[in-house]
Amino acid sequence: MASGTVKWFNSEKGFGFIAQDGGGPDVFAHYSNINAQGYRELQEGQAVTFDITQGQKGPQAENITPA
């Protein structure tokens, strides 16, 4: 499981990017992959843990959990 910080997240569009701790490419984050109840969103600067998978356009975060 990887860790990182939310770089930005657009709640209206339901996606954003996470900067990985230790470097590497930013990881795409979609609201459907956030482990939370109710309205799922992330805040800029929020620490998270996640799994990285390879999506159609690059690395993608799954099982996103606020740290």
Swiss-Prot record:
GO BP annotations, alphabetical order: regulation of gene expression
Pfam family, one: CSD
Main localization category: cytoplasm
Record's keyword annotation contains ATP-binding: no
Residue span, CSD domain: 4-64
Gene Ontology MF annotations: DNA binding; nucleic acid binding
Compartments it resides in: Cytoplasm
Gene3D superfamilies: 6.20.370.130, Nucleic acid-binding proteins
Signals that turn on the gene: In response to low temperature.
Statement: the UniProt record of this protein carries the keyword Mitochondrion: no
The protein, known as: Cold shock protein ScoF
InterPro entries: Cold_shock_CspA, Cold_shock_domain, CSD, CSD_CS, CSP_DNA-bd, NA-bd_OB-fold
Source domain of life: Bacteria
